[in-house]
Amino acid sequence: MLSPAIKSRLRKLPGFRIASFLRRLTRDTETRNAALMLLRPPAGLYQPWGATSDNRYPEAFLSVRALAGDAPTTRILSFGCSTGEEVFSLRKYFPQATLIGLDINPWNILLCRYRKWRKGDARMHFAVAGSTTTQPSESYDAVFAMAVFRHGELNITPPPPRCDHLIRFSSFEQSIADLARILKPGGLLAMQNSMFRFEDTATASQFEPALSIDCSGPVPLYDRDNMLVPSPARETVVFRKRT
C-alpha cells in the first residue's frame, strides 16, 4: 500500500487525473457510474464517490433520536444517502418515522429502492436529487447531511491550500440555506465529515448547537474564501433550528 506522501506526489504528475478516471471505469458498477457522472457533473455535486457503512454515525443518530423522538408523524431526510446504508441504519433508531433518502447518483437510488423492496418498508422513500429545492418548507423534523459537503481529491497529504477548483463555499452555503428552509422550527440538522463549517454560514444564526464531539479524523477544512484553515479538535455535529 502506498504511503499518503507518495500518493500526494502521484496526484501532481501530468495525466494523473485522466489515468485515475480510466481506472475507475474498470472497477465496480458504483465506482464506474460515479466516474461517468464526472464527465458532465450535475448541479449540486460535491462528493462524487460514496463512502458509507452501516451505523456510521451512532453519536449523531442517538442524539437526534433523543431530541426529536419517534412517532408516525416524524419525517427524517437523509440528504446524500448514497447506497442507503444511512437510511437503513436510521430505521433502527426511528422504527415509526417516515424516512426519505435523496442522492444525486441515479445508480445509488436504484440500489436503495431495490433494498427497500427487499425489506418491504412502506414508510421509506428514495429519489434522485442534488438539492432539496423541491421539498416543502418546514416539512422535516430532522435532516442528516453526513459526509456530503466534501471531495475525496482534497483529502490528501498535504491538502490543497484552496478547494474552489473542486467545491465552493458559496455552493455549500446555498445548500445549507435550503436544508434550513425545509426543517420545522425546533428541527435538527446533523452534519459531519464536512470540509466546510456550518458555523461560517449566514444560516447558522437560525440554529443553536445540540451536540459536539471530538473530531473523528484529519478532514481538511476550508473557510468562506475557500482557503485551507486549521481543523479543530472538536466539532458541533447536531444543530437545532430556533423556534
Task: Specify the residue positions occupied by each region the protein language model found.
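Conserved SAM-binding strand-loop segment of SAM-dependent methyltransferases
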Residues: 119-131
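Conserved SAM-binding loop
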Residues: 112-113
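Class I SAM-dependent methyltransferase Rossmann-like catalytic core
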Residues: 32-71
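A short acidic, Gly/Pro-enriched loop at the edge of an enzyme's catalytic core
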Residues: 132-147
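Conserved beta-strand signature within the Rossmann-like core of class I S-adenosyl-L-methionine
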Residues: 176, 186-193
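Conserved SAM-binding motif I beta-strand of class I
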Residues: 98-103
